[in-house]
Amino acid sequence: MKPAYFISDLHLSEKHPELTALLLRFLRSSAAGQARAIYILGDLFDFWVGDDEVSELNTSVAREIRKLSDKGVAVFFVRGNRDFLIGQDFCRQAGMTLLPDYSVLDLFGCKTLICHGDTLCTDDRAYQRFRKIVHRKRLQKLFLMLPLKWRTRLAAKIRRVSKMEKQVKPADIMDVNAAFTARQVRAFNAERLIHGHTHREHIHHENGFTRIVLGDWHNDYASILRVDGDGAVFVPLEKY
């Protein structure tokens, strides 16, 4: 059977065209074109201030994803902490299906829970409070009513503050909370969990389930997980 591919945390921006080039290379590969599905688990973009922002970056990415969709490859998207404002308009343009924060898939007989991963980092209480605020629908609606230029400036300011805070945060609170994560997996009756966000690429064999962490993309490295009937494995982009 055709494999499924999982990617996350590309953090695409005009400042890093090499990352966009990596993504386009993957999307144009024969492997992607022959996949049963591709799942993008958040932070595809480094920031997102609304579907009404039109740029060469956004347009080119949407165009290449749409080409895969038009070939019959199902493409799914889960919002991340950087691009949580991506809406149905952009997803329709790209031919992607927008998924909720948590979804359960039947992958080759293995019940698999997928999410971005930020909701699992419950020890970072300051972030969880911030997340709760910015995910309020009324606040998002008000933000999206602002002029695009204002939204861009606000997003840049928030990113600067977030970067400074991250430099002084203990590393352990920026990882998933093991007990909470295990409870979530059990609540969804899953055998496997796939998530991103922490940038700590690894396949963990936990008590009763497998937890697969997608890595971030940087320089000439792309973290791509292939899942098929034989299991799950990270495959270098060079093989595509």
Curated annotation (Swiss-Prot):
HAMAP family for the chain: LpxH
Compartment(s) where it occurs, according to its Swiss-Prot or TrEMBL record: Cell inner membrane
One MF term in the entry's GO annotations: manganese ion binding
This protein's UniProt keywords: Cell inner membrane, Cell membrane, Hydrolase, Lipid A biosynthesis, Lipid biosynthesis, Lipid metabolism, Manganese, Membrane, Metal-binding
Cofactors (names): Mn(2+)
CDD domains on file: MPP_YbbF-LpxH (cd07398)
Main location group: membrane
InterPro entries: Calcineurin-like_PHP_ApaH, LpxH-like, Metallo-depent_PP-like, UDP-diacylglucosamine_Hdrlase
Any one Gene Ontology BP term: lipid A biosynthetic process
Name of encoding gene: lpxH
Known EC number: 3.6.1.54
Name of the molecule in the record: UDP-2,3-diacylglucosamine hydrolase
UniProt membrane topology term: Peripheral membrane protein
Binding site for substrate: 81-82, 124, 162, 166, 169, 197
Pfam families registered for this protein in UniProt: Metallophos
Xref: Gene3D superfamilies: 3.60.21.10
